[in-house]
């Protein structure tokens, strides 16, 4: 789903695609949590309940869905593509529509199992909860999202007359179906703004006035909870003439954690990369990748340039790691611990251009890290800038077997060569 958003706004982003997403840590919550939150803001959502055990599943079926003939059982992981995913146990699909008396059985096949989707990577994610929902009778499926758009310097509503799993393809084949409505961040959403969205979607059955109110409520949720992205796919029309958020994905700005206590209490660290969780605890910007060369760099731009040059020389970066401009020795030590905890890392490249960040602090951190962590892989170090001579002296006097480099190109080349030794 997120692919469409990236494609539609790529012109307004200085960095598009995957790397853009890596510059901000964003809270991602489960579908059932998003539905609960939307319900509090008056957004129409399907009746549903989350369960983490077969006992809870059985109770929910009896208490919440006593008269339903069919239910939707949805695995809850923080990744897209669940419907087309495969469990390592062999079960196909992380979303199933089943008869009421089959719901407990299918939930049992999901709970505690690892689901692999196009977004999880081959390792997959463990399903700790399932979401039981009423099966809606849908007459139309559409797409709706709100994002933060740099070009318009504010929220942007993106909608499409057609929804579902093929939204990216539809955006390419039928660009005239895409509706984009920028919202004035100071004035907020107006009736006219909401009407543009609804008239563009042209609902077949849902009441126009009610639909306008639903769009306004979705925007209020986006604004009041510090969302960075709200995506509903599908935004569905039911046989009862209602507009319903049938499936939603919400991300929130981590910088708002101090004032969004209720929202951030929903965080599920068990679904996050443990390395990213550890990095966040010490204020490091870290994103795990699948390569072999661990990177520690100061500055997001330099970090991305470092990864690009590693690729240019035939290597693959194992991570994005920006220690920032004011890192302490402790943070450098913790950064090394995170890098060395990745079994795929066969070499480490430290690339520091000291401005506010001092090279001697980095050097001391490297030496202290070596005392706490058994460095079993070659380490390539390129230092330049503030206190560079002090930094080089600290490294030399440490007696560590380091590979030094004169510039970034040299450092990347040496890191790639070090993989062969």
UniProtKB/Swiss-Prot annotation:
The keyword Transit peptide applies. GO terms for biological process: tricarboxylic acid cycle. It holds the Pfam family Ligase_CoA. It catalyses: succinate + ATP + CoA = succinyl-CoA + ADP + phosphate. Binds 1 Mg(2+) ion per subunit. GO terms for cellular component: mitochondrion. Residues 1-26 form a transit peptide. Keywords: ATP-binding, Ligase, Magnesium, Metal-binding, Mitochondrion, Nucleotide-binding, Transit peptide, Tricarboxylic acid cycle. Residues 35-278 form the ATP-grasp domain. Pathway: Carbohydrate metabolism; tricarboxylic acid cycle; succinate from succinyl-CoA (ligase route): step 1/1. GO terms for molecular function: ATP binding; copper ion binding; magnesium ion binding; succinate-CoA ligase (ADP-forming) activity. Belongs to the succinate/malate CoA ligase beta subunit family. This is Succinate--CoA ligase [ADP-forming] subunit beta, mitochondrial. It comes from Arabidopsis thaliana (Mouse-ear cress).
